[in-house]
Amino acid sequence: MSRAGKSVRRQLYVRDHSLKIGGVLYVVAVFQFFVFELVAETLYPGYSVSGNYISDLGATCVSPPSTLNCVVHQPSARIFDSTVFLLGLILLVGTGFVYYGTRKKPYLVTAAVADLAILLVGVYPENTGWTHAIVSVVLFLFMGISLLLAWTIVNGAAIRYLTVAFGVLTLFFNFTNVPAGQVGVGGQERLLVLRILLGLLTLGGYLTGQDSPAPVS
């Protein structure tokens, strides 16, 4: 093989392994959140998946973003804040690897902003008032956009339509209250978050399963 051919093959090897690492990090981030969010729920006295917001696990306020009449239940708050922080941090690192393998700047920017917003939700729980409210809005908005743009890093795969669908649904239900009457505010938020997590798992699973060329010596 010529020197130029070896160089191209080596670049492809590094690129594909960056995508694999990014995909693994996406999957790990989501699974650890699934597990520890459930643990936080079980330790929260009288928690209702339909009546309570997910962020209530970090701090519960009667009328958010007002910081009046807020209560923090430990250890559920500490567990929840930690798993949200880890979710954002691991996703942010994973997005860096995905960018290294794709060089798609629109996806990088939107995904990185969303990941950073997730991280900040873990730093600023519900009892921080408008700070929490603002980063939550940024989270849902940019995560929906990033899932839409994920089609640019899924080459020739039908799975790209799934990420687009998750992105569209995330943005649509972020600005509507369609299911709130049937499932409560907690159920409504969970449906929104679930679309995001499933979108990330779909993308992460795709990237993890990519075939890599053999390394070049």
Regions found by a protein language model. Give the residues of each.
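Short, Lys/Arg-rich, polar N-terminal cytosolic tail immediately upstream
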Residues: M1-H17
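Hydrophobic cores of alpha-helical transmembrane segments in multi-pass inner/ER membrane proteins
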Residues: S2-R3, L86-V93, L141-L149, L194-G209
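N-terminal signal-anchor transmembrane alpha helix
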Residues: H17-G46
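Membrane-interfacial loop-to-transmembrane alpha-helix junctions, especially the N-terminal start
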Residues: G22, Y26, R103-A111, G156-F166
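Extracytosolic (periplasmic/ER-lumenal) interhelical loops and adjacent juxtamembrane/interface segments
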Residues: G46-S76
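Individual transmembrane alpha-helix segments
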Residues: P65-V98
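Membrane-proximal helix-loop-helix units in multi-pass membrane proteins
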Residues: L108-W151
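Terminal transmembrane helical module of multi-pass membrane proteins
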Residues: A150-S217
